[in-house]
């Protein structure tokens, strides 16, 4: 049985995400719905792409992913049903799929046209739910529109390599719920460019000279527990998705702040790694 996932910028205050689930239950009965996130920053396509890219691979092939971010149809933006990496994605052609498909080519891109006469301010319920239900029942996406060969392009920022100064100049691409700062510097790039040289990571006025393998590596287990002072320690590591992440060990953003607020870092801010 397929899984239907939801990734939106609806938040949890309003009725929007509940309405989508209600419409899916109304169409399909006892369907398995998973919320990936409803807290994408409003209309932030790049943030939504980061979240869904790092989540969808954990679901079984054949899963259906509804992407409700900047989803309204207009003369410059149609709706899509895309099969990619064995999964189905239903979204607007707003560039989000180009960010997901920059590593894997889509198997099929369908421009949805069965709703051309429908004027809606809530496309996720009025259109996306119906397409998801069609796919869930075993219907072909070829029946919901016409095939197209390309996607609207949206380009993410990539790290700059300076061979002369031996630097990687990267950027913040995501800040999570713990205020951990995720950069666009991959572990592969770090290893290939750095070639095991010593390094220094610079994030505004903060410097890191070590990359740990896990959050708990910040703990001095050789010190008696009562004397440890690791809470609040700044750490750098490559996260599960192999991107360089800056963090503060066990910080609570609601009380003392996390890496983003304490380091003064936000989306697109520069992080550099200088090799010696």
Model feature map: region roles:
Residues 27-28, 43-47, 60-62, 66-69, ...:
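Active-site histidine-anchored catalytic micro-motif
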Residues 119-197:
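Anionic-ligand-binding alpha/beta catalytic cores of soluble enzymes and soluble regulatory domains
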Residues 5-6, 10, 22, 29, ...:
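Short acidic/glycine-rich loops and adjacent helix/strand connectors
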Residues 2-5, 31-34, 63-66, 79-81, ...:
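Structural motif
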Residues 1-76:
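N-terminal glycine-/serine-/threonine-rich phosphate-binding loop
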Residues 182-265:
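A conserved acidic, glycine/proline-rich C-terminal tail/linker
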Residues 85-88, 92-115, 175, 200-217, ...:
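Conserved subregion of the PPM/PP2C metallophosphatase catalytic domain
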